[in-house]
Amino acid sequence: MEEEDMFDLLKKFTGIVGVSGNEEEIREAIIEEIKECVDEIKVDTLGNLIAVKKGKGKKIMVAAHMDEIGVMVTYIDDKGFLRFSAVGGVSRYDCIGQRVKFKNGVVGAVYYEEKLEDMKNLQLSKMYIDIGARSREEALKMVNIGDVACFVGDAVLQGDTVISKALDNRSGCAVVVKAIKELKKTDNEIYFVFTVQEEVGLRGAKTAAFSIKPDIAIAVDVTMTGDTPESHPMEVKCGGGPAIKVKDRSVICHPEVRKLLEESAKRNNIPYQLEILEAGGSDPGSIHLTAGGIPSGAISIPVRYVHSPVETASMSDINNAVKLLVEAIC
């Protein structure tokens, strides 16, 4: 039942188009889930959703970014084909032959303008989106310059495995939503922040942390794994438990926050792994440099094929991340 409930939430969240800078729909979906479980809800100027459980103890910030990678229309030619640029870390190798979906429901196919002899020469600038329009005028009735689209990848549950687009980071959002619902009592004052624009530079977390000025911050996000044939050697694997971040390219996690997370896991027999991510950053990267310095750390959900339409994770890792977060902040 626990896995079914979590999968339903994941399916709901991952099915929403929420490319960086366009997080309105996922934000409203999260509000609908948590509005009866917190003392205060507000949306700041940048678009971060901040939900507060009031208390007199430590001020704790829990962050999970709402946005996903995607593409933005930059040009429409006379035949109705769309040129685009990446929003966030879009892999050119994962684009060709994929479907993309716009916020208004329009779906297009991504393809290449010429025969490709060598994949090393693959360029986003030579790709286009076909939405079935026969002219520029017809295309403009369907989409416009500046419109964004996400990749299509419906959530599928297979045993303990979930496969979907946007597990980065709708899985983190789902973990925080479940933690809000399960956290019955705490003396701490907890600011649950669903941040915007993480994929384009950790932007929302920075402004939210500056306004909240928490005593500590814990982010919930995904991390890469080292358990597939092509992967770089890495200790983290799917099914091994949530990962406690040691460092990535944007942050060396504060030792006291890491200690809090490790001790919470050990005390409650929650399996965990230690994460050292050599590429990529996360919200603690901007949080820890804000307001004079904020002790920051992260719980990471191991995900294979990050930034692809087939991101793959373990449901047990996701559910154990909920347990770890609740124990760490209560």
Curated annotation (Swiss-Prot):
Record EC number: 3.4.11.-
Note on cofactor: Binds 2 divalent metal cations per subunit.
MF term (GO), any: aminopeptidase activity
Binding site for a divalent metal cation 1: H65, D168, D221
GO biological process: proteolysis
Residue positions binding a divalent metal cation 2: D168, E199, H307
Alphabetic keyword roster: Aminopeptidase, Hydrolase, Metal-binding, Metalloprotease, Protease
Domain of life: Bacteria
Root EC class: hydrolase
Active site residues according to the UniProt entry: E198
Keyword Hydrolase in record: yes
PANTHER family (alphabetical): AMINOPEPTIDASE, ENDOGLUCANASE
Family from the record: Belongs to the peptidase M42 family.
Protein name, UniProt field: Putative aminopeptidase
Organism listed in the record: Acetivibrio thermocellus
